[in-house]
């Protein structure tokens, strides 16, 4: 098993990536290079930074990548709030995605704390 797959933080981020990709399929075409792309990139970045950090040798390097992942998750939170405000996402869908984002952020933060 790849080293990153054992972390709940990565597992939650991976689920979030898939959910964001599905949810953004229905965004307007004019948002393809805007909010659609930004939301997808932020979600993907969170998971990808955990993957990259897990491949590093030292704890400090891993913590650095976890910091980047946390920033990406915060960026995604804002993108989802904008998408809901613009009515690209139904309130229920936005709430589900935001709950997933919060869960992913929590486990990523806990993983970072465990690296002390």
Listing of model-derived features with the role each one plays in the protein:
Residues 1-116:
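Amphipathic alpha-helical assembly/interaction segments
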């Amino acid at each position: 098993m790849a080293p990153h797959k054992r972390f709940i933080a990565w597992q939650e981020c991976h689920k979030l990536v898939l959910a964001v990709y599905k949810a953004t399929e229905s965004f307007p075409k004019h948002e393809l290079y805007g909010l659609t792309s930004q939301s997808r990139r932020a979600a993907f970045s969170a998971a990808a930074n955990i993957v990259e950090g897990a491949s590093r040798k030292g704890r400090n390097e891993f913590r650095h990548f976890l910091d980047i992942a946390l920033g990406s998750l915060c960026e995604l939170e804002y993108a989802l709030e904008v998408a809901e405000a613009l009515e690209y996402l139904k309130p229920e869908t936005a709430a589900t995605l935001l709950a997933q984002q919060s869960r992913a952020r929590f486990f990523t933060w806990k993983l970072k704390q465990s690296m002390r």
